[in-house]
Every structure is written in structure tokens, then in C-alpha cells.
Amino acid sequence: MTRYQTLFTHLQRRQEGALVPFVTLGDPTPSLSLQIIDALVESGADALELGIPFSDPLADGPVIQSATLRALQAGVTPERCFTLLATLREKYPQLPIGLLMYANLVVNPGIDTFYRRCAQAGIDSVLIADVPLEESAPFHAAAQRYGVAPIYLCPPNADDVLLQQLAARSQGYVYLLSRAGVTGSDRPCLPPLRHLTTRLAALGAAPTLQGFGIQTPDQVRSALDGGAAGAISGSAVVDLIARHLDTPPQMLQQLRAFIQTMKAATRA
């Protein structure tokens, strides 16, 4: 079984959902980034979704854009990110680790080269935010060659044709969007998406993880009650980093408390 399959099977037995935080690699510095990720994992994160800094992050809201800028200003490059990823894989051999990318960072070194490096670093999945399903063939093929799960976005207005395509191609998990737009939101209520999770499950799709706007334990619970296997929280995590840039010990303490509270909601 893959790491994702092992995780979802384990959580299902325990009647828990998955909590998957997102952070940008190297934010605010490479060394502190590793400490942040340690805090997330030690506090209950079931898997990680990690971003490689890119100068034009179209799908990201201002919070994650700022994180990207901080990492770039700290000199973080894709090369440095792969070094960090290799360190994380060695430290956490069973933890599912996914990348959330933009196509330029995959195309520039060569699609085949990029996925080969992912496999060498022990990456479980890659989601390319700006490549729609209908343009994904070369990326999907390379991912398959190197045993990396290609992750696809399921929008809240997906029709049945798209759901069938997602189910047929899905591996690892399906990223279920709470809403359209960019990451981060102050909306307290998530739209009901059980019709999507139910249909995807009936079609044999990989488990769904719901993201975009997941900032509170109640929203985690809402995602799980709607049939998602877990929740991805990014902007809320990155916002805590931004608020405590000058006081790293307090930052790490706040992150631990947040993850513990969010993870507790997966067990309710």
C-alpha cells in the first residue's frame, strides 16, 4: 500500500479524519521552516501539503503569497526545497508528503526530471494548481512513471462528467475545493458538498480531502460530516507564522496548540 492508503486505512479503523496542514517550504527561513514542520507533525498532523515558492502564485490568497515572498527573500530555491524534502523524508519515513506546485516549476527543469527528483526525495503526491485536468496528460504520465500520485482539484460545481474523469485518474486523494477563488477565507460556513463526496466514492475515486477556507475546528468537523476523509488547512497555519515572525518560540507554541485543536475535531 502507498503511504496515503496506509494512512486512510489506519484512520478509518480509528474513526478519525485526516488533518493535513499546508506550509510553504523555507518560510520564513529554511531552518525555522523545518522546526515549524516538526511542530505540525508532533502536534498531530496526519500528512503534509507543502508549497515550493514561486514568484507568481495565482491560486493563493495574500497570506500564502506573503509566505512565498518571505521564502524567496530568504534565498529558497527549488533545489533547496528538495534538500529540505529529503531531510523530512528521512525523519518521517511513513508520513505522506505532498507538493502543491505551479506548472512553471515543473516544466522548467523538464517534466520527467522534476518527477524523478520527487521520487528520489520520497514525495508521495504532486498537485499542480494551474494545470486543468484536460491539460494534465504529460504531467500525469510522468507521475505514473515515477510512482508519484497526481492530485486533482474537484471544484464545488463539478458536473458528473468531471467527477467521472476525476475518479478515473485519482490516486492518493482528491482535493475537494470548498469554494472557487483563491486560498484563505473568512466565511465561517462551508457549503454542503456531500453530493460530491458520495458520487466520487460511488465512482471508486481516491478519498477526498477538503481544502480552501478551513480555519476552525467546526469547519474541520463540517468537512468530515460532508463525507470528506479529511481537511487541509493552509492559510490559517501560515497566518500564525506571519503573526509571530519576531518570536519563533511563541510561533511554534501557537502552531502546536492550533494543530492539536484542529486534530481533536477529526475525532469528534
UniProtKB/Swiss-Prot annotation:
A GO molecular-function descriptor: tryptophan synthase activity
InterPro entries in the record: Aldolase_TIM (IPR013785), RibuloseP-bd_barrel (IPR011060), Trp_synthase_alpha_AS (IPR018204), Trp_synthase_suA (IPR002028)
Keywords, ordered alphabetically: Amino-acid biosynthesis, Aromatic amino acid biosynthesis, Lyase, Tryptophan biosynthesis
Superkingdom: Bacteria
Pfam families: Trp_syntA (PF00290)
A GO cellular component annotation in the UniProt record: cytosol
Catalysed reaction, written as an equation: (1S,2R)-1-C-(indol-3-yl)glycerol 3-phosphate + L-serine = D-glyceraldehyde 3-phosphate + L-tryptophan + H2O
Gene designation: trpA
Role according to the record: The alpha subunit is responsible for the aldol cleavage of indoleglycerol phosphate to indole and glyceraldehyde 3-phosphate.
Source organism phylogeny: Bacteria, Pseudomonadati, Pseudomonadota, Gammaproteobacteria, Enterobacterales
Enzyme class, UniProt record, top EC level: lyase
Species name: Edwardsiella ictaluri (strain 93-146)
Family statement: Belongs to the TrpA family.
Statement: the UniProt record of this protein carries the keyword Ribonucleoprotein: no
Active-site positions on this chain: 49, 60
Entry protein name: Tryptophan synthase alpha chain
Assembly and interaction partners: Tetramer of two alpha and two beta chains.
Pathway: Amino-acid biosynthesis; L-tryptophan biosynthesis; L-tryptophan from chorismate: step 5/5
EC number: 4.2.1.20
